[in-house]
């Protein structure tokens, strides 16, 4: 429990994810710290996934909307998309955001944390495939699951 005096210190020093990314970007631009380059470039995309999860938004719907495409994609995203054979989907915002999140995880998480998250993701995929026949005729969901599995496999 926080004492009365420490509660104020906690409130003054707490930073949400959006502010953290802004600070990392500011710090990277000012000092050129190479270890923060990926966080600066890809943090905003990962923020979209974080916010969707925090607010219980559905990620797998409306992924391939024509009006939901990015005109410009970071070179790191393009390289990763080529590696996992999803290059033609890299400009879709949700695919781009998911790739951003996983590239950041590979760059900044320990092997043990990566393994833990990979197992959790694989468990989710197994749960999704349990009722695969229910959505087998939904082309968008089926395509997203294929793309999602390819992206996650690189962890």
Feature map (PLM): residue ranges:
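Single conserved hydrophobic/aromatic residue that forms the stacking wall/gate
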Residues: 1-10
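Polyanionic, low-complexity intrinsically disordered segments
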Residues: 19-44, 48, 58-155
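Flexible, active-site-adjacent loop/turn segments at secondary-structure boundaries
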Residues: 10, 57-58
